[in-house]
Amino acid sequence: MKPNIHPEYKNITLTCSTCEKKHIFGSTAKKSSVDVCSNCHPFFTGDRSIQRTTGRVDRFNRRLTKSAEK
């Protein structure tokens, strides 16, 4: 193996954008983010409720039908 060609492997802190919990991982990346972690994901918490978020298309169609009714 050639010396000095491999990226630096270091510990980085990832913060969950949902629950703001911090996790430490080893990575070659300088910065990274996580939307849902094991602390707040329904699979790991045992929460059986379905969380549905409306996307852009659903919001657009809702606004379109609302404006057509006027």
Curated annotation (Swiss-Prot):
SUPFAM superfamilies: L28p-like (SSF143800). It comes from the Bacteria. The keyword Ribonucleoprotein applies. InterPro entries: Ribosomal_bL28/bL31-like_sf, Ribosomal_bL31, Ribosomal_bL31_A, Ribosomal_bL31_sf. Keywords: Ribonucleoprotein, Ribosomal protein, RNA-binding, rRNA-binding. GO terms for biological process: translation. The keyword Ribonucleoprotein applies. GO terms for molecular function: rRNA binding; structural constituent of ribosome. Transmembrane segments: none annotated. One of its GO terms (cellular component) is ribonucleoprotein complex. Pfam families: Ribosomal_L31. Part of the 50S ribosomal subunit. Binds the 23S rRNA. Belongs to the bacterial ribosomal protein bL31 family. Type A subfamily. This is Large ribosomal subunit protein bL31. The gene is rpmE.
